[in-house]
């Protein structure tokens, strides 16, 4: 059997799972893997490879890491590989916009996008699906065009978002959904057995990359909205508030009470309303939020009991979180 020649482009673990599926299927000749440059991470600012690069190196695939594709040496190398007209492009969470001339010369160009398009075009679809309280998420295999995530849809599959899910768990689930969907549908698509369907432009929504401002918790929102925001940013970029003028990250929480604050007992949003040796509850614009896992400035992530036994002893009922 002649293997389909492709160039794979992707960056995080989601993409590495998809790439591993392509490798293991033994149906594809992967001429090159394109991923983001190594980045410095953590307090020690250690240089770290992307999960896609780590995987590619273990199986001796050539790796290209352009800071930006347009005008780069790597772009020239990719164009050379594509010139035969027999090589396709497969992407999954690459993190860069592909120049149009790549799409022009590739045999085909398909993207594994982690949303049920046309909802959540953009770089943070899983984050926004959770933050918006969606009950399901999914993956779309789609044709790539010059407009971001706007190409015709080849296939879709969905999976539930459970109350206990966060960005990390959904990334993992959807990576396998995307892997299986791509492996099932790409051969059929290339053989002409599947016809791509246009997206309904009236139903388009966007999920741009999370801004630093978006990470801040607005305590005037409801407990349910803040709960969704916290899990929609765990484990990255992590929702945060201020305590004593310093950043206070919240990784996990739960809605303790969704009753609307009434005029007989008005609570100030962001105010600590209950503190025991094992729990900490905060008033919101509507309802009470219980904090479960936090990270004070300059400290490691910890469960709420550890926090309350240590630094949290300084926190008192009536104290206010936020600006």
UniProtKB/Swiss-Prot annotation:
Ribonucleoprotein among keywords: no
PANTHER family (alphabetical): METHIONYL-TRNA FORMYLTRANSFERASE, METHIONYL-TRNA FORMYLTRANSFERASE, MITOCHONDRIAL
NCBIfam families: fmt
UniProt cross-references to Gene3D superfamilies, sorted A to Z: Formyl transferase, C-terminal domain (3.10.25.10), Formyl transferase, N-terminal domain (3.40.50.170)
Catalytic activity field: L-methionyl-tRNA(fMet) + (6R)-10-formyltetrahydrofolate = N-formyl-L-methionyl-tRNA(fMet) + (6S)-5,6,7,8-tetrahydrofolate + H(+)
Protein source organism: Lactococcus lactis subsp. cremoris (strain SK11)
Sequence similarity: Belongs to the Fmt family.
Gene Ontology terms for molecular function: methionyl-tRNA formyltransferase activity
Protein name: Methionyl-tRNA formyltransferase
GO annotation, cellular component aspect: cytosol
Binding-site list for (6S)-5,6,7,8-tetrahydrofolate: 115-118
């Amino acid at each position: 059997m002649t293997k389909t020649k492709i160039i794979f482009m992707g960056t995080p673990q989601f993409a590495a799972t998809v790439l591993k599926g392509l490798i293991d299927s033994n149906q594809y000749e992967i001429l090159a893997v394109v991923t983001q440059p190594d980045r410095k991470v953590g307090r020690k600012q250690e240089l770290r490879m992307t999960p896609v690069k780590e995987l590619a190196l273990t199986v001796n695939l050539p790796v290209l890491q352009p800071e930006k594709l347009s005008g780069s040496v790597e772009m020239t190398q990719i164009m050379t590989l594509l010139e035969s007209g027999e090589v396709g492009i497969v992407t999954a969470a690459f993190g860069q916009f592909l120049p149009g001339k790549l799409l022009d010369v590739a045999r085909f160009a398909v993207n594994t996008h982690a949303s049920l398009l046309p909802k959540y075009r953009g770089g943070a679809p899983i984050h926004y699906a959770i933050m918006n309280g969606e009950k399901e998420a999914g993956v779309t295999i789609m044709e790539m065009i010059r407009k971001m995530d706007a190409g015709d849809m080849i296939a879709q599959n969905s999976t539930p978002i459970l109350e206990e899910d966060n960005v990390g768990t959904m990334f993992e689930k959807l990576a396998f959904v995307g892997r299986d969907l791509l492996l099932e549908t790409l051969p059929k698509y290339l053989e002409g057995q599947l016809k791509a369907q246009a997206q309904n432009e009236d139903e388009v929504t966007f999920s741009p990359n999370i801004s630093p401002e978006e990470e801040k918790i607005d305590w005037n929102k409801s407990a349910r909205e803040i709960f969704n925001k916290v899990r929609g940013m765990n484990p990255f970029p992590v929702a945060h508030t201020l305590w004593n003028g310093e950043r206070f990250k919240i990784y996990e929480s739960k809605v303790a009470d969704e009753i609307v604050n009434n005029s007989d007992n008005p609570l100030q949003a962001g105010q600590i309303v209950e503190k025991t040796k094992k729990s900490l509850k905060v008033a919101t614009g509507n309802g009470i939020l219980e904090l479960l896992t936090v990270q004070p400035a300059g400290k490691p992530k910890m469960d709420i009991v550890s926090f309350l036994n240590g630094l949290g002893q300084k926190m008192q009922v009536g104290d206010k979180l936020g600006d």
